[in-house]
């Protein structure tokens, strides 16, 4: 056992702040000699097709796969660890259990072997980690492993029905005796997609194959345990610049998992956002809540960020994260999130000066945590993309928000780290230095890290991953040796949280205070007491921005009182107070109180003082502006006003890259107006303007406005002007900007045209995206997609005998395909094609007759129709005749005739009035179409259309006869073959009322 007891002095606090800590290495145990490690070349897309076939194990992304990811967890007195077995030809998934009480080690070997990068076992992939958890409620073991955004179709279909890998044990397996801790305690897959009798991998976590779409395209499994023992799993859905975090929940009572729920939407552009984006960070369950912290990678390749930008943070007040999501200020956010700006904390890219496209590199050294009392800590790093540039910059950032504070404190006084952890109210940096573990500690809500543990002997480690539980670090490490099989160790390090419980309790009256510049008084009564009976507070020291103000050794611990008015930065408020010669300037200041008790234990509290400026308020119309080289006009109306009543603005001066342009002493403060068109670098735009002899050339320029008020106070504002020269990116085009197909289409192959207009350059790649999701990167011409070896790329079903039907064809709607061409200079162009998938049309059907008019007592009526299917592969099932929504008869083969032959009377019962006739055709796809006509049945004898036959009709009948109008032969009531006056008696007999002749 190794113990290092230290008393260290923080460089930021000089000699005033010390921290006692006794951190001990409790146990170290070797888990195996055979942890899989990739010892070969780091491949890329140019050589991944030719990996080493010998002993060396080439890899993609990184060399680590064992002791990597979510690979170590605890359950009661056991520590569980996952790993892959080395060497190169083994690769089995392994699970080890260490009994911390008796030192017993149990290991299970699973049949599954690491499948390698995109299914090539000769190329290792570091992203295919094994996530691990044990339910504290029922003792089931859960593992999700060996996947990187796979689905049924990508990578040539290599992962069909095997794109998600989940293994789980029976209840109670976690604490079985050593002899019973065996593979048979895990549940086999007996579903229809099982790969055999030794298949312990399940395609879904719900047990329902109908849910398999919910488990596709996932990466980076990580489990959490909530305060009530519920297991949660989170993973990343999708790709690097178009992704989402998803999570699900385990119900220990029913031993079942839910489907995945999204924290944020992917394909954000389709949902109204300006661009698609992915997440680089973590979802964590800390301090009793599910939380998310990440950096964003957008698909904008023309901004100053090479990959990621920003720091984003959110948390959920729902016990399991299913709703009630908020930003760090407690404001509700859209859930699932679409616009990441709703939860943005700050921009690390603002901490270096580069502005050119792809010049800022924010990758790695990002992590975050939250202490038990609610202090939020986020670490990040920003540097120049080009390490060789003369003005190379690199900044490590620690942003933290003490519990109760309203805003983050952003500190660049931070040496940097890759991960940050928490236990109790402290934050920790745990890592390797010279291959040996060390621990640094800071009180939550502070930036005061000191080293409390470091190993000076023992094995030299290559890397590791860790889990902290109940004040102990379970550090799972791989020893640095050689080959494709290297030893794995577990170290258990006690963080000595018990001593922290004895530390003093210290606090400011408020976590944050806002005052105006020139404030006269700020008195702070700092509360400090010991939680341990018999101890007393020896002193309280106040620091402002890490500078010691004073140490007070007696109650009350009051700073800024009448005898010391200046120590809190105030001017003074009594007549006897001389004005403070060094008052606090406008801006944010960190006040820190350090309490030390009679045993030498100490604690720290912080307060943020925001000092509002009295200086003028000045601003450009916008912070940055892009124009094309040779721009004709740039007029800038600079806003300037005093923040103090009674003061006025004396002048506003404009500078370009430090050179004075002009000082304006009267409103409006307008530069680049018609009388001075050249002063902002423009060419001029009026006929009276001669061309600018010295226009601003392509490049970036800093415009600075300096506003001065009548008291001589100044304020500066800046604007970045980017003058864009003519870029010459590749030219990429589709054969057609819009393609229309019918659902179920078998084939769609398209060759994309890509070329560079610049001599000496060539096209390096053409990348195809479907609705924002990566389809494939093609690195050699011709740029053909959807060909016979990749028939599904445009969503087609497949057309050759060897093509299995596409299980995920594109549905009805409009789909956007984006082609991105990249040339040898790194310039990119993109163009979109709209693929419109139409619903298969129903059959065509037509009633041959037009609208029909009949009289009651009609004797004959037949209706005929013709129909055909929309496609040769579709058959016609039936035609059905409806009259007034009443089915008359359905006919299953032509001829389609109603009212003839054996059915001659089926249409003879229509009553007086108008009837809707519909013929509905149905095809073998259950698609339907219809044709319709109207049949109008008039009352026989009702010549004036008043719905009765009466004397008026007989008179009209006689009148029509006299006028020689042709009458319907059905009015030949006496059957002599003509309609004449002798038929009047027959009409009278049809009168609606009796005694028609007397009406």
UniProtKB/Swiss-Prot annotation:
MF terms (GO), sorted A to Z: lyase activity; metal ion binding
Keyword check for Glycosyltransferase: no
Signal peptide: 1-21
Covalent S-S links between cysteines: none
Keywords: Calcium, Lyase, Metal-binding, Signal
Residues binding Ca(2+) 2: 300, 303, 305
Residues the record marks as active site: 127
EC number assigned by the record: 4.2.2.-
Residues forming coiled coils: none
Pfam families the UniProt entry points to: BNR_4
Residues at which Ca(2+) 1 binds: 189, 199, 201
GO BP, one annotated term: polysaccharide catabolic process
Binding site for substrate: 126-127, 280, 297, 361
Site (Neutralizes the sugar carboxylate group at subsite +1) residue list: 236
Database matches in InterPro entries: Dockerin_dom_sf, Ig-like_fold
Family note: Belongs to the polysaccharide lyase 24 family.
Purpose: Ulvan lyase involved in ulvan degradation. Ulvan is the main polysaccharide component of the Ulvales (green seaweed) cell wall. It is composed of disaccharide building blocks comprising 3-sulfated rhamnose (Rha3S) linked to D-glucuronic acid (GlcA), L-iduronic acid (IduA), or D-xylose (Xyl). Ulvan lyase catalyzes preferentially the endolytic cleavage of the glycosidic bond between Rha3S and the uronic acid GlcA, but not IduA, producing oligosaccharides that have unsaturated 4-deoxy-L-threo-hex-4-enopyranosiduronic acid (deltaUA) at the non-reducing end.
Name of the protein: Ulvan lyase, long isoform
Protein's organism: Alteromonas sp. (strain LOR)
Lineage: Bacteria, Pseudomonadati, Pseudomonadota, Gammaproteobacteria, Alteromonadales
């Amino acid at each position: 056992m190794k113990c290092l007891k230290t008393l260290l002095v923080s460089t930021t606090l000089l000699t005033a702040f010390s921290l006692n800590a006794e951190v001990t290495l409790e146990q170290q145990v070797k888990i195996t000699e055979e942890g899989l490690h990739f010892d070969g070349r780091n491949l890329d897309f140019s050589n991944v097709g030719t990996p080493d076939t010998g002993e060396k194990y080439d890899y993609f992304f990184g060399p680590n796969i064992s002791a990597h990811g979510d690979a170590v967890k605890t359950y009661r007195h056991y520590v569980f660890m996952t790993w892959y077995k080395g060497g190169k030809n083994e690769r089995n998934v392994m699970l080890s259990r260490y009994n911390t009480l008796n030192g017993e080690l149990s290991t299970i070997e699973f049949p599954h072997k690491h499948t390698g990068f995109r299914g090539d076992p000769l190329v290792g992939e570091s992203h295919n980690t094994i996530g691990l958890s044990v339910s504290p409620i029922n003792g089931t073991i859960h593992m999700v492993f060996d996947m990187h955004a796979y689905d049924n179709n990508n990578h040539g279909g290599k992962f069909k029905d095997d794109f998600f890998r989940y293994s789980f044990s029976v209840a109670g397996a976690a604490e079985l005796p050593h002899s019973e801790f065996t593979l048979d305690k895990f549940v086999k897959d007996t579903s229809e997609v099982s790969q055999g009798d030794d298949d312990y991998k399940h395609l879904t976590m719900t047990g329902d194959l109908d849910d398999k779409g919910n488990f596709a395209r996932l990466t980076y499994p990580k489990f959490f345990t909530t305060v009530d023992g519920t297991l949660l799993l989170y993973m990343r859905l999708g790709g690097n610049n178009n992704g989402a975090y998803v999570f699900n929940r385990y119900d220990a009572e029913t031993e079942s998992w839910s489907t995945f729920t999204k924290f944020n939407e992917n394909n954000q552009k389709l949902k109204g956002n300006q661009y698609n984006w992915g997440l680089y960070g973590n979802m964590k369950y800390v301090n009793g809540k599910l939380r998310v912290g990440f950096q964003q990678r957008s698909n904008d390749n023309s901004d100053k960020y090479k990959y990621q930008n920003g720091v984003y943070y959110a948390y959920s007040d729902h016990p399991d994260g299913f709703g009630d999501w908020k930003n760090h200020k407690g404001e509700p956010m859209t859930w699932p999130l679409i616009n990441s700006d709703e939860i943005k904390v700050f921009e690390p890219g603002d901490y270096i000066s580069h502005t050119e496209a792809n010049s800022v590199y924010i990758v790695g050294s990002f992590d975050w945590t939250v202490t038990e009392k609610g202090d939020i800590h986020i670490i990040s790093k920003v540097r120049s993309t080009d390490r060789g540039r003369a003005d190379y910059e690199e900044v490590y950032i620690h942003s933290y928000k003490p519990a109760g504070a309203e805003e983050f404190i952003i500190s660049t006084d931070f040496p940097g780290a890759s991960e940050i952890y928490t236990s109790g109210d402290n934050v920790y940096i745990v890592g390797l230095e010279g291959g040996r573990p060390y621990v640094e500690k800071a009180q939550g809500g502070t930036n005061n890290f000191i080293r409390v543990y470091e190993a000076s002997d023992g094995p030299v480690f290559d890397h590791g991953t860790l889990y902290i539980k109940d004040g102990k670090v379970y550090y799972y490490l791989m020893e640095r040796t050689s080959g494709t099989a290297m030893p794995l160790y577990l170290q258990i390090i006690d963080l000595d949280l018990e001593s922290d419980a004895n530390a003093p309790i210290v606090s400011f009256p408020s976590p944050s205070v806002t005052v105006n510049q020139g404030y006269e008084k700020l008195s702070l009564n700092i509360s400090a007491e010991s939680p341990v009976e018999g101890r007393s507070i020896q002193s309280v020291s106040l620091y402002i921005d890490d500078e010691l103000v004073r140490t007070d050794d007696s109650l009350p611990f009051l700073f800024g009182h009448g005898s010391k008015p200046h120590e809190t930065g105030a001017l003074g408020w009594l007549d006897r107070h001389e004005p403070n010669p060094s008052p606090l300037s406008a801006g944010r200041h960190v006040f820190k109180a350090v309490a030390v008790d009679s045993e030498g234990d100490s604690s720290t509290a912080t307060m943020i003082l925001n000092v509002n400026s009295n200086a003028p308020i000045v601003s450009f119309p916008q912070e940055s502006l892009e124009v094309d080289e040779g721009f004709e006009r740039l007029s800038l109306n600079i806003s300037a006003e005093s923040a103090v009543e009674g003061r006025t603005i004396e002048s506003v001066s404009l500078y370009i890259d430090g050179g004075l342009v002009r000082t304006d002493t009267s409103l409006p403060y307008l530069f680049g107006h018609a009388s001075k068109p050249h002063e902002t670098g423009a060419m001029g735009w009026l006929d009276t303007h001669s061309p600018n002899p010295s226009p601003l050339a392509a490049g970036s320029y800093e415009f600075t406005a300096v506003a001065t008020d009548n008291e001589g106070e100044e304020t500066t504002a800046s604007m970045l002007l980017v003058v864009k020269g003519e870029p010459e990116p590749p030219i990429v085009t589709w054969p057609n900007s819009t393609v229309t197909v019918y659902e179920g289409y078998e084939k769609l192959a398209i060759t994309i045209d890509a070329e560079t207009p610049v001599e000496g350059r060539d096209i390096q790649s053409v990348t195809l995206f479907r609705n924002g999701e990566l389809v494939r990167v093609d690195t050699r011409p011709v740029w053909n997609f959807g060909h016979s070896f990749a028939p599904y790329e445009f969503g087609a079903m497949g057309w050759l005998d060897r093509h299995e039907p596409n299980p995920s064809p594109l549905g009805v709607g409009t789909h956007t395909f984006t082609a991105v061409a990249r040339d040898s200079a790194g310039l990119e162009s993109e163009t979109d094609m709209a693929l419109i998938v139409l619903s298969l049309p129903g059959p065509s059907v037509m009633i041959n007759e037009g609208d029909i008019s009949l009289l009651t007592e009609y004797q004959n009526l037949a209706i005929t129709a013709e129909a055909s299917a929309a496609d040769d592969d579709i058959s016609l099932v039936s035609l059905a005749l409806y009259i007034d929504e009443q089915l008359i008869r359905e006919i299953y083969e032509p001829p389609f005739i109603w009212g003839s032959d054996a059915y001659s009377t089926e249409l003879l019962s229509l009553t007086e009035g108008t009837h809707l006739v519909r013929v509905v055709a149905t095809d073998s796809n259950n698609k339907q179409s219809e044709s319709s006509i109207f049949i109008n049945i008039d009352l026989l004898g009702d010549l004036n259309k008043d719905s009765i036959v009466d004397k008026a009709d007989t008179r009209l009948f006689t009148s029509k006869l006299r006028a020689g109008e042709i009458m319907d032969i059905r009015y030949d009531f006496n059957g002599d073959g003509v309609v004449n006056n002798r038929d009047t008696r027959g009409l009278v007999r049809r009168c609606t009322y009796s005694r028609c002749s007397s009406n």
